[in-house]
Regions:
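Intrinsically disordered, Lys/Arg-rich N-terminal extensions and targeting peptides
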Residues: 1-46, 119-124
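Residue-level "contact hotspot" at macromolecular interaction interfaces
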Residues: 40-43, 57, 94
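Short, charged beta-turn/beta-strand-edge "cap" motif at the junction between a beta-strand
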Residues: 53-60, 82-84
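Structured, basic alpha/beta domains of bacterial-type, RNA-associated proteins
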Residues: 63-119
Length: 124
């Protein structure tokens, strides 16, 4: 992004193509995962276990599984993080991916795990 103006940055993020927005869904790894895989961050995927490090006091520190990932908005739905509607029903409250730390990967995606191990081998 070429501009330094905040509103131009926001517009570029909002109008970015999906392959660029996908990269904006990355979160830092926990210290243990960082040492194991040799990378600092990775994309958040459904089934990962994450810890919320920023946000409201009642959700901060929560560690739970990712239920859904919204590429368009750059937010993640985390198990147990809900808000109440006016009629009393609880709905999922999406959290921005930058406010999360990945503590455990969903190991069902073999391509993703191979990709992480290749990155580790490349650093060695």
């Amino acid at each position: 992004m070429a501009s330094s103006k905040a509103r131009v940055q926001r517009k570029a993020q909002a109008n970015a193509p999906s392959h660029v927005k996908r990269k904006m869904l990355s979160a830092h790894l926990s210290v243990e995962l960082r040492e194991e895989y040799g990378v600092r961050s990775a994309r958040v995927c459904k089934g990962d276990t994450v810890a919320i490090i920023r946000g409201e006091e009642d959700v901060r520190g929560t560690e739970a599984k990712v239920l859904d990932v919204f590429t368009k908005t750059g937010r993640v739905s985390v198990e147990g993080v809900t808000i109440n509607q006016a009629d009393g029903t609880a709905i999922a409250h999406p959290v921005h991916a930058s406010n999360l730390i990945i503590t455990k990967f969903n190991t069902e995606d073999q391509w993703r795990m191979d990709s992480l191990s290749r990155k580790k081998e490349a650093k060695e």
